[in-house]
A protein has these predicted regions:
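Bacterial N-terminal signal peptides that target proteins for export
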Residues: 1-9
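The canonical Cys-X-X-Cys-His
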Residues: 31-40, 78
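N-terminal, post-signal-peptide region of Sec/Tat-exported proteins
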Residues: 42-80
Length: 99
């Protein structure tokens, strides 16, 4: 049931945010949402919380502990998603991690 809810929410956001890579968004929801959901171990986030360059530098400087299960390619896709929907982007995203 929970997986269906996440899939439905992801689909709704995809429709609302044209040009989003479905795979990148799915990684964001899965990997980031594991901790950054309401009641999770980390504060809730959404891409529009920061400017694109801030997201990139945040990860470059190693400030985020990361997901031990995320490969380098997954992390790049997540960062690309965050930058594409950051506060200073053409399509800033509202919160998309299920609460």
């Amino acid at each position: 049931m929970k997986k269906r809810l996440i899939a439905c929410m992801a689909l709704a956001v995809l429709v609302a945010l044209p040009g989003v890579s479905a795979a990148s968004q799915a990684l964001f929801l899965q990997k980031c949402g594991a901790c950054h959901k309401k009641g999770g171990t980390a504060a809730p986030i959404n891409p529009a919380d920061k400017a694109g360059q801030v997201w990139e530098k945040y990860f470059e400087r190693g400030r985020h502990p990361g997901d031990p299960g995320a490969s380098g390619g997954d992390l790049k896709a997540i960062i690309d998603y965050l930058k594409a929907h950051a506060a200073d982007s053409d399509q800033p995203a509202a919160a998309v991690i299920p609460k």
